[in-house]
Regions:
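Short, structured motif recognition centered on aromatic/hydrophobic residues
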Residues: 1, 15, 21, 34, ...
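N-terminal beta-strand motif that seeds the catalytic metal site of vicinal oxygen chelate
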Residues: 1-9, 55-58, 117, 122-153, ...
Length: 300
């Protein structure tokens, strides 16, 4: 995931000292590369200084160069993506060739097959359960993004029929269960790797989420938010959708972050969980059971 920030160094301080990511490099364009401690790849987050906050792109690593070639062809031929192009190897640090495209919701996505591994701060033989000297909330990995866009049907078709994602959960209209309001998609065993909400706009970014181990770590994250005087959005609380335990807060540029624990293991044959719009408050905030307009209405 690549994010735009308004002032680079305060953003880096937030993502390293508050969230607890590790800086792994900087390139000639001034971009900063970060990873969570238990990720082996060189980076999972890229920060770039810009005039407007938001998401540049979300990237997906596939299992081989052949898969990358096959999927890029399918995306180009699907009619569900525009602006398809190849980014040469080395344009990002420690990263191979990338295939870039824009979804019907206006979000830029990338596929890649090669990224150098730097390890997870632990040995591969007889390791300890976690490394010393972690900072901040100390998430173990980047988890997912929630994105806003207008053509929900098109992006869901692209992700399911072309890219092979599963729908894990969905929100539908109370009086028309064929009309989807939101869809949660997984290409793994997680409750979601990306989610989309139908909104009358293109390319909007709601939040990026990072995984913690348990509810106690979510509460500790709340303490860190208060100690560091970070802008709190809401939480700690629980989602009905995904069952996740959560707290939301903002980076200095206004990009929303989440740290998240719990959830469930998703298998490809698991039936889709459906929520109806009349119960949306409980679906999003299981304890309060009320919609929060600031949570839904603030995005970058």
């Amino acid at each position: 995931m690549a994010l735009r920030v308004l002032d680079l160094e305060p953003a880096v301080k937030h993502y390293t000292d508050v969230l607890g990511l590790l800086e792994t490099g900087r390139d000639k364009q001034g971009r900063v590369y970060l990873k969570a401690w238990d990720e082996h790849d060189h980076h999972s987050v890229v920060l770039r200084e810009a005039d407007a906050a938001g998401m540049d792109y979300m990237g997906w690593r596939v299992d081989s160069i052949q898969t990358l070639k096959d999927l890029s062809k399918k995306v180009e031929e699907s009619g569900l993506a525009t602006d398809c192009c190849w980014i040469p190897a080395g344009e990002h640090l420690e990263t191979g060739e990338r295939f870039r495209f824009t979804t019907t919701t206006g979000h830029t996505m990338e596929l890649l097959a090669e990224k150098n591994k730097v390890g997870n701060c632990l040995p591969l033989v007889n390791p300890d359960p976690w490394p010393d000297d972690l900072k901040g909330m100390g998430p173990s990995r980047f988890d997912h993004c929630l994105l806003y866009g207008d053509d929900l049907d098109g992006v869901v078709k692209l992700f399911t029929e072309v890219l092979g994602f599963d729908i894990t959960e969905q929100v539908v209209a109370e009086d028309n269960h064929d009309f989807r309001i939101s869809v949660f998609l997984s290409c793994s065993t997680k409750p979601h790797d990306v989610a989309f909400i139908r909104q009358p706009m293109k390319g909007a970014f709601h939040h990026a989420s990072f995984i913690l181990d348990n509810w106690g770590e979510v509460l500790r994250a709340a303490d860190i938010i208060s100690k560091k005087k970070v802008s709190l959005d809401l939480g700690p609380t629980r989602h009905g959708i995904t069952r996740g335990e959560t707290i939301y807060f903002f980076d200095p540029s206004g990009n929303r972050n989440e740290v998240f624990a719990g959830g469930y293991i998703h298998y490809p044959d698991k039936p889709i969980i459906t929520w109806t719009s009349d119960d949306l408050g409980r679906a999003i905030f299981y304890h309060d059971r009320k919609l929060n307009e600031n949570f839904l209405g603030v995005f970058t």
